[in-house]
Amino acid sequence: VWLFAVASVCALTACSDNDTENPEGEKTGGENGKPTPETVEFINSNLVYWGDEDGVGTDHFVLTLYTDMEVDAAGNPIGPGKIMAFSLNVPPFASGTTEFPLPEGTFDAAPNGYTFNEWTFNLGYMNQMDLPTGKVEVPAGSFYGDVKAHSTSVDADLLSGGKMTVKRSADGEYTISGVLVGDLSLKRYFTYTGKLTTIDRHGSTEEIPNSTLNADLTLNEWAQAR
């Protein structure tokens, strides 16, 4: 079950009327005319632990970060807002472990869609889903998404490069940040600070959606597969 904070949309980094975005996803008008990166500050999170459900030798987390958005009755965030999903490969937890916090580390892009090395994030891809209304494609793996204003529809950028860092303080608070690049060749600067509560799905035989976000008909039923 996914819970979303019902609150007003938080303010993101603003720019003057003269600021324009350059091809790297940065904004001009910074100090000495240098591009000023626009960093998305996420405030909501959801973390699911799947274990080594694919038998590839690494454990699998799905981390999803959101900006502050209202939600509809079905739990779908209503834009405008932003979302990032991360499919993460980590060293296996020891046998008998009962708690599964996201480990600290630096994650690089996996070299391809078939390699699941430790400390990598899996590349984004489109996954075809069969629904009563027909076949639709939804983003899977790691991706960035813009949630359209007054809508639950999401425009996704499939992530394929960059680096992200996960740090955890003594009191259990996380700081997650990085710069990732996707199919649109834009640099996605982001940060998140807050708690992460792990939802343990490893060993589950039931396929459970990773989110209830909709893109027109569906971004719900995001795939469990890496």
Describe every region a protein language model picked out:
Residues 65-68, 176-183:
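Short beta-strand segments that buttress and anchor functional surface loops
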Residues 10-46, 202-222:
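Bacterial Sec-dependent N-terminal signal peptides
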Residues 1-13:
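Sec-dependent bacterial lipoprotein signal peptides
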Residues 36, 162, 179-226:
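Edge beta-strand at a domain terminus
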Residues 34-48, 52, 56-57, 69-71:
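N-terminal accessory/targeting segments that precede structured cores
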Residues 90-92, 170, 180-182:
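A mature extracytoplasmic/lumenal domain signature
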Residues 166-174:
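A short, structured loop/turn motif at beta-sheet edges
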Residues 54-165, 211-226:
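Surface-exposed helix/loop patches within compact recognition domains
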